[in-house]
Swiss-Prot record:
This is NADH-ubiquinone oxidoreductase chain 4L. It comes from Equus caballus. It is a multi-pass membrane protein. It is found in: Mitochondrion inner membrane. The lineage of its organism: Eukaryota, Metazoa, Chordata, Craniata, Vertebrata. GO terms for cellular component: mitochondrial inner membrane; respiratory chain complex I. Core subunit of the mitochondrial membrane respiratory chain NADH dehydrogenase (Complex I) which catalyzes electron transfer from NADH through the respiratory chain, using ubiquinone as an electron acceptor. Part of the enzyme membrane arm which is embedded in the lipid bilayer and involved in proton translocation.
């Protein structure tokens, strides 16, 4: 395993630990999710380029599409919660249940 792979895996792990530890604000959770998706994108791109597997060449693009959808839903939820309650605490999301 090269140093680049270790650094990308470490970035994913740090983002995951940040997501698990700092769950008080929605914005910090969204930033940690974004870091995870970025490291997954880089890992998928490197895998496709290193293995020359042409059938999987669309996988990084599909991952970016899902990341954009996740980003849009997360930001719309952030705007809705902060307009309704005035703060972006994750604990306010429990009040949105039907």
């Amino acid at each position: 395993m090269s140093l680049v792979h270790i650094n990308i895996f470490l970035a994913f792990t740090v983002s995951l630990v940040g997501l698990l530890m700092y769950r008080s604000h929605l914005m910090s959770s969204l930033l940690c999710l974004e870091g995870m998706m970025l490291s997954l994108f880089v890992m998928a791109t490197m895998m496709v380029l290193n293995t020359h597997f042409t059938l999987a060449s669309m996988m990084p693009i599909i991952l970016l599409v899902f990341a954009a959808c996740e980003r849009a839903l997360g930001l719309s939820l952030l705007v809705m919660v902060s307009n309704t309650y005035g703060v972006d605490h994750v604990q306010n999301l429990n009040l949105l249940q039907c």
